Amino acid sequence: MQWPTLWAFSGLLCLCPSQALGQERGACPDVKVVGLGAQDKVVVIQSCPGFPGPPGPKGEPGSPAGRGERGFQGSPGKMGPAGSKGEPGTMGPPGVKGEKGDTGAAPSLGEKELGDTLCQRGPRSCKDLLTRGIFLTGWYTIHLPDCRPLTVLCDMDVDGGGWTVFQRRVDGSIDFFRDWDSYKRGFGNLGTEFWLGNDYLHLLTANGNQELRVDLQDFQGKGSYAKYSSFQVSEEQEKYKLTLGQFLEGTAGDSLTKHNNMSFTTHDQDNDANSMNCAALFHGAWWYHNCHQSNLNGRYLSGSHESYADGINWGTGQGHHYSYKVAEMKIRAS
């Protein structure tokens, strides 16, 4: 190879655009001389890169690669919406019978059942309460034969206790000059004076024998009493007629036997044996005859009084001109 030829070729190579592929202006290609032997030498000129040629045709797809190793488990995704309810499955076989449980508590009673139980097992009188160990005088609930509850004053101190008080006068705070309906239903104040009611008196005395005790106290504090073997009051259709037993004893004497078998009289219903209304005449309400030997529902007067027989009088005690400070009528089953 001749040198002039090489340099001429070299000049042609230097004619390549200086801007090709981002070459800076004035940049020269590198020239390297490679010795091949003693006589020949080859000059290698690294010229600027040419413009890229058009893309070649798409090659054939390669053979599939082998399955790679399993990657790490990803985090769980969000819960999807609930699906529709499926059809119930078939009933499974019965399970093994369990062990017997403990005995349960007794069932609670309803209002009616509780009321019936209290009626059947509850006290029927103050005497009944006494036999159950109640020894204090006071107000208690007993049950009538028709199972209705009734609050009564029980005297647990006098004459062995067990007395049901149905009439009480102590201070004049209650007016006892009342009509038929008032005496039928009862009236007064639990803490002071009262009449229990003729309907209740009938129910309390209709079955079994009831003895009667009358306790009196004058304004000097002296007490006296009268006691009868039995006491019974009929129903309203018979005008609450009094049926009285034998006078047994008492320092006050017997001022009630005269009124035996008499009907009850008030100022608006006259059932006595007098041509006039004894209740209106003597300002009370009682089993008047013609008219009375006792009038414990009369006016509350302060001891001796000039008026005749219109106070809380007990004839065989201090007469018809003396009104007692305290009067109590009470019954007890015998």
Swiss-Prot record:
Keyword Cell membrane: yes
Domain Fibrinogen C-terminal: 117-334
Cell inner membrane found in the keyword field: no
Record's bilayer topology term: Peripheral membrane protein
Region described as P domain: 325-334
Annotated GO biological process: cell surface pattern recognition receptor signaling pathway; complement activation, lectin pathway; G protein-coupled receptor signaling pathway; innate immune response; positive regulation of interleukin-8 production
Cellular component, GO, one term: plasma membrane
Signal peptide: 1-17
Region (A domain): 123-162
Binding site for a carbohydrate: 290-292
Classification via SMART domains: FBG (SM00186)
Residue numbers marked as site, Mediates specificity for sialic acids: 308
Residues glycosylated per entry: 261
Binding site for Ca(2+): 270, 272
Location relative to the cell: Secreted; Cell membrane
Function description: Extracellular lectin functioning as a pattern-recognition receptor in innate immunity. Binds the sugar moieties of pathogen-associated molecular patterns (PAMPs) displayed on microbes and activates the lectin pathway of the complement system. May also activate monocytes through a G protein-coupled receptor, FFAR2, inducing the secretion of interleukin-8/IL-8. Binds preferentially to 9-O-acetylated 2-6-linked sialic acid derivatives and to various glycans containing sialic acid engaged in a 2-3 linkage.
Description of its domains: The fibrinogen C-terminal domain mediates calcium-dependent binding to carbohydrates and tethering to the cell surface in monocytes and granulocytes. The domain undergoes a conformational switch at pH under 6.2, and looses its carbohydrate-binding ability.
Protein name: Ficolin-1
Organism whose genome encodes this protein: Mus musculus (Mouse)
Gene behind the chain: Fcn1
